C-alpha cells in the first residue's frame, strides 16, 4: 500500500491567545506538529504533505527542515478546502491518510488499523465515544449500525446532538474517489466552509462501506485548542512516558513529578530518578545511575554508577562512570568528566575536560580548562579564561593541588604534582613538583588601635 500522509496544520488557534501558531506549541519538548510528523515517518509513508496557513513563516522557520512537502492554504475555508490544496500530490492509486497537526498523541498501532480498513470499496474512519461530545461532528448510523454520514454540531438536530459517537477527523481513503468527492463538496452550511466530513455521505451514496475504527483510549485523539487543553495533554503525555520508563526498569520516586521532554537513547539497569527531574534532548543513562531531586539534564551522557545530586543543572556534558556531581552543580556544554570525578556544590564547569579521580568540590568556576588525573581543586578556585576579547585555556597537569581561593589567569599551565598556595593569583606557568604562591607577606602591627567613632552630643548637653 502506497500511503500519502496529509497533515492539516493551517488553523489559527485564536483561543491560544498567542503570537505563535498553534501547531508550534510544545508537548514533551516537541511541537505539536512534529509529534504528528514523527507518527507519519514511523508509518514509512511515501510522502508527507503539510498544509499550513496562519503563521506560515514561523512554521517553516521552525520545522521547514523536515523532509516533507509544504503547501500553503492562503484562505482557510474548512478542512475540505485544506485537502483540496494538496490534490496535485494525490495519486489515484495511493491511500491518503488525513491527520491533524494539533492531535499529537495518536498511536502508530491505531493508525495502522485504520489504514488496513481503507480499500477499493471502503473508507477508514476513526471515531470515538465521548461522555461529553460537545463541539464534535456526530456519527450518524442507520438501524443496522452502518455509518451514513457525519453531521457537524452547528448543523445537527437536537436528536443528532444526543449522539455520543463523534468524528475525530482522521480518516484513510483511496486517492481516486477522494479527488472525485472533493470536486463535489459544497459550502452551504452554517459555517460557510467546505467540510471534509461530507465525503462520508458521498461514499455511502456510491456504495462504499464506512469502516469505523476506535482508538485504544480517547486520549489518543484529543486536540489542542487552548492553553488548558495543552496542559492537560502534556500531563497525559508525561504519564505515558513515566509508565514506559517504569516498564523498562526505572524507579521513579513520583511518576507525577517527572518530565521527559526528549528521548532516552540509552538506558541501563536499576536507574533511580527522584522527584521534579526534567530530561530534555537526547539522554543516555548507564547502569545504577542515581538522579536526585530537582535536577535538569539536557543532551547528556551519564555513565554507570554516577550520582547526580539535588538541584544540579547539566547540559551537553559527558559524565564518566562512578562520578559524583552536585548538589547545586552546573555542567555546561562540552564538559567531559572521566571516571571517578567529583564536582561539588556551587561548582560550574564549562567546556572543560577533567581526568580520572580529580575533584572540584566547592564554590569554583572551571572554564576552558584541561585538568589531569588525581587533581584536587580547592574551594573558591577560579579559572580566569576571558580577557575581554578572547577565551584562553588553563591546563592543570596530573597530581596537582590547587589551594583555596586561587585565581588561575589563562593562558596558564600548572605543572605535574605542583602545589599552589591558598589565596594565590597565578599568571605564569608553574613548574612541576614544587610549591608556588603569590600572596603578600602577612604583617601584624602591634599597638594598633581601631579608629573610634565620633561621639554624638546629646540634646541635653
Curated annotation (Swiss-Prot):
Main location class: cytoplasm
Signal peptide: none
Annotated spans, Linker: 228-248
Cofactor: Mg(2+)
Active site location: 362 (proton acceptor)
Reaction catalysed by this enzyme: alpha-D-glucosamine 1-phosphate + acetyl-CoA = N-acetyl-alpha-D-glucosamine 1-phosphate + CoA + H(+); N-acetyl-alpha-D-glucosamine 1-phosphate + UTP + H(+) = UDP-N-acetyl-alpha-D-glucosamine + diphosphate
Domain of life, source organism: Bacteria
Subcellular location(s) of the protein: Cytoplasm
Cellular-component GO terms for this entry: cytoplasm; membrane
Gene Ontology BP terms: cell morphogenesis; cell wall organization; lipid A biosynthetic process; peptidoglycan biosynthetic process; regulation of cell shape; UDP-N-acetylglucosamine biosynthetic process
EC number: 2.7.7.23, 2.3.1.157
Keywords: Acyltransferase, Cell shape, Cell wall biogenesis/degradation, Cytoplasm, Magnesium, Metal-binding, Multifunctional enzyme, Nucleotidyltransferase, Peptidoglycan synthesis, Repeat, Transferase
Region (N-acetyltransferase): 249-461
Family named by the database record: In the N-terminal section; belongs to the N-acetylglucosamine-1-phosphate uridyltransferase family. In the C-terminal section; belongs to the transferase hexapeptide repeat family.
Name of the molecule in the record: Bifunctional protein GlmU
